[in-house]
């Protein structure tokens, strides 16, 4: 089985950080969905340069509505969401690829609905991580409720 993982992002005026984020996942995600909520900078151009499917969504001051719109465009079996300033560390890429292999090996009935991923915050000037916690970052597409 070859299950796909779609990266889904909502962005606005993220030209300073978006390229770094997309570079960190370009070899991990099978598809990149970038939903722009009204950028006036080069955000769209940068996303398109990485081969992302870029769409527009009028901002209604509702992150969940924009996120769900992004999810609705994805064709993958699993949806990975990141913010534009998030990065998958190089040291974690092999672990991510092993996760994809494990997902491909599982029968449909055993697939998880949610996958929690480590999330590093509070990185100091020397690069030391001050805090790591787990966040839901990957969800199974067909397990999402239709709202």
Regions of interest found by a model, annotated:
Residues 2-6:
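Extreme N-terminal starter segment of soluble prokaryotic enzymes
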Residues 28, 50, 132-134:
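Residues that flank catalytic or metal-binding motifs in active/ligand-binding sites
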